[in-house]
Amino acid sequence: MVWDHGPTGRTVLTLSTPTTFAAKGAVHAFAALGRPLAPDVPHVIWAHGWGQDHHAFLALARSLERAAHHTLFDFPGFGQSPAPPQKADGSAWGTADYADAVADWLASLPRGRRIWVGHSFGGRVGLRLAVRHPAAVDAMVLVGSHGLRPRRSLVARARIFLRVRMFKTLRLLEKFGVDVSARKAKYGSADYRSAGSMRPVFVKVVSEDQTEDVKAIRMPMVIIYGALDDQAPPDIGERLSKLIPGSSLSILPGLDHYTVLTDGGPQVAHAVAKLLEP
């Protein structure tokens, strides 16, 4: 693993000249702010959602700047981090690969109290990290997190079934040389259509279900969802809170998948601040 030391202290590390670390063959760009990293200084790791980058959490991290050292990732494939390489078997990265890379990096750092804050995809990776590397962090805040398969109505399940059947038909037509790219774009989700070179990762990640795995998690966990979130419905949070012993759940009225980070920012910051208390 390679660690590129950038400036420390209370100045945000600009990603115009990104500070990076390399783990599991992937380069991770990141920004840092707050107190210098040291064994007696808490460390908050902010993990953004799919299609976002470190800026998603920058305002929240700044609000807690004096309380801890803060690292804000650009996960491989987002922001200024290049896409992760294919694995040796030719398959795409999944959440386990992202979690393993982060764990490798954390193992190289001074060991203070660590808190993982993950939104959406960042929550998926956090759950995987908590299961595969339970000693890597001490507590988590999950915000609008994915990780469990959402429960859908009969109508929604029928629509998904028809969409899957259409994709299978399109793949068959591709084998005969038919250009079906426009049709694929039509039937894919917005994230699927915009995924580009990250599409294999996206397809793998959204197919994962961590329901059985998360039962093994034993750490303080605060779970926050927006009541109007239609991308990571609060039902996921309700199930997570039942599966993870000792976790707490807050569902914020009137907020969706993204406003839970802005209008709901004070609640998220409060949850992190409570976990930072000695």
What are the residue ranges of the model-derived segments?
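Active-site loop/oxyanion-hole signature of alpha/beta-hydrolase fold enzymes
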Residues: T20, G25-A26, L33-G34, L72-V117, ...
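Catalytic active-site module of serine/aspartate enzymes centered on a nucleophile-bearing elbow/loop
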Residues: S248, G254-P278
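Alpha/beta-hydrolase fold catalytic core
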Residues: M1-I45, E65-H69, D97, L109-G112, ...
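Acidic catalytic loop of the alpha/beta-hydrolase fold
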Residues: L228-A232, Y258
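Conserved alpha/beta-hydrolase catalytic His-Asp/Glu region
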Residues: M166-M219
